[in-house]
Every structure is written in structure tokens, then in C-alpha cells.
Amino acid sequence: MGGVSDERLDLVNERDEVVGQILRTDPALRWERVRVVNAFLRNSQGQLWIPRRSPSKSLFPNALDVSVGGAVQSGETYEEAFRREAREELNVEIDALSWRPLASFSPFQTTLSSFMCVYELRSDATPIFNPNDISGGEWLTPEHLLARIAAGEAAKGDLAELVRRCYREEE
């Protein structure tokens, strides 16, 4: 398995159709032209397991993040990437848990960074996470998480908007 440095990603057009490929490390990479997956691990009390990114991450080190997230590699479907990322980051086989797709988003119709599919995993167990990706984590309600981000706690760029779009009731 290759590292992030040699990940090949599909380039997509405004309709999320594959039009080419690019290496993740290519300086010409524009995130709105690639696909990503994100997932939230949610417990029976409605809390989300929110990890803190490893300090060695090049993007958003030490920041709060989605439970699972990553780029869809070239040739993968969104679901295949979700399965791979859940296994790599949380040591979870998704079919051992209850899970569902939550939403799909376009960067051309939202302020989100990329084309993305968002999933939800259900479990009351705290995951055994990959320490290369994650330095720790905690269970938070969506409201508490949004309050911490609003108060200035470092978070990955799309986290607050994803929580609002997927978990906050319309006001």
C-alpha cells in the first residue's frame, strides 16, 4: 500500500464525472476537483466521536476532525473509499456496525471543499484508532462540538459545516 505521497486521485468535472487523474502531491491539485469521503461515528446518546488529528499531519495538525475522512483514490467508489478509510483510521469493518449514507455534497453548490459523500456509523464503543492519523478523541454532541469550534478551537475546514448540514435541525 502506498503512502499519501503517491496517492493517485480522479479529477472530476462540475457534475462529479471523472475527466482525468492527478497525484495527491501535485501542486496543481485543486480540492474542488477531487472526491472525498467523511463519516461520523454516532452513539446511542446522539454524540459524535470526534478525533483530534495527529500533530504530524501536514493539513490541520492537532485539529478536531470528522470520525473518518479521506480522499477517494483513483478507480474507487465513494463506498469503497469509506470502507478503506474506516479500516485504516478506526480499525473498523463497517459491515460489523450499523451504517448509512447521510448526504452527498458538491463544492459548486456549497462552501464545502470537495465533492463528498458523508456516512454515519452507529456504535457505543470508542474506536481503537490509528495513532499515525489520530492523537485522541472524545464523544461530543453536535451542539457542543459547534460551540467549541465557534469559541476558536482548531478544526478541519469542513467540520463545522458538515455537522450543521448533517445534524443540526433547521431553525
UniProtKB/Swiss-Prot annotation:
One of its GO terms (molecular function) is magnesium ion binding. It is an enzyme of class 3 (hydrolase). Pfam families: NUDIX (PF00293). InterPro entries: NUDIX_hydrolase-like_dom_sf, NUDIX_hydrolase_CS, NUDIX_hydrolase_dom. This is Nudix hydrolase DR_0079. It comes from Deinococcus radiodurans (strain ATCC 13939 / DSM 20539 / JCM 16871 / CCUG 27074 / LMG 4051 / NBRC 15346 / NCIMB 9279 / VKM B-1422 / R1). Residues 32-162 form the Nudix hydrolase domain. Gene3D superfamilies: Nucleoside Triphosphate Pyrophosphohydrolase (3.90.79.10). Optimum pH is 9.0-9.5. Mg(2+) binds at E85, E89. Keywords: Hydrolase, Magnesium, Metal-binding, Nucleotide-binding. It comes from the Bacteria. Its EC number is 3.6.1.-. Belongs to the Nudix hydrolase family. CDD domains: NUDIX_DR0079. The keyword rRNA-binding does not apply. Hydrolase that converts various nucleotide triphosphates (NTPs) to the corresponding nucleotide monophosphates and diphosphate, and nucleotide diphosphates to nucleotide monophosphates and inorganic phosphate. Has a marked preference for cytosine ribonucleoside 5'-diphosphate (CDP) and cytosine ribonucleoside 5'-triphosphate (CTP). Has lower activity towards the deoxyribose nucleotides dCDP and dCTP, and towards dGDP, TDP and UDP. GO terms for biological process: nucleotide metabolic process. Its cofactor is Mg(2+). Monomer.
